[in-house]
């Protein structure tokens, strides 16, 4: 699309085709991050066979993760804990990558067990300016896909926060990035270090939490940048006020391994009130198809601090009524009320425990 727009004299509101290609290919993106001085995980270039993967995994040290070079959305990613698994996992990951992306190229990275997923929102213009709008924590995930996001990231030091923001700006500046983008990192909580994961050259699903605490309309900035205007803000203009949390409400039954639940919505009563934002396409009578992503709504709540934002989110989820399809509302209420989540002790495996401990609320209201 970006190429077609350029060839026909149409200005795409978004980054260039070259940047999309560079960051869309994870191996090239890793190389560009390293060139910009951004830490990267021990890993590999393209892995051509299971035997080669075994050799690299032995050098890096287990566990490792096999990843699709053209991947995204959690597809084409497999954790390997034993060398004996590699042949089978390599075949499965390459087949999944080929089916999802038309490219079965794989690479290896060291796997971090006690990890957090922290990302930084950046904006860049055609005049060489790049700023960040702070970071988000997106560690609460199922199948490598985000479920709850919040900003700013809790339980990190000021030094860590400054360093991860600086790294994101460094990468975007180094490649001359124009538009809104998100630089994603994996944080090793045991070592207190972070590593480049990928860069998404678009507005993220979770961008509202950043908008709510900065007061900056990211989409409006995208249009201004596309029109050739300089950024509306210098870095010194960006201030973080309060705390925002976003819950993704999906048509899925969490207790059944997040099984999709298509159907017709027979009741739709979202919460309302100060500090509540709802981004959704749904309404009573809407039919949720079986063919597309299961996201029904993004519920965003803002408070003066994290504790008050959590309390407000708990209330908002409690008053959200959806019938006709199974949803993740019960799971989200359970997650927000969890002691570890409430204290900010999160990692990318938290959802696995939450599902095991989730109380039985009976069948969903369908």
Mark where each language-model region is.
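N-terminal beta-alpha lobe that positions the nucleotide/phosphoryl donor
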Residues: 1-183, 187-204
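Catalytic cores of soluble metabolic enzymes centered on carboxylation/carboxyl-transfer
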Residues: 168, 208-366
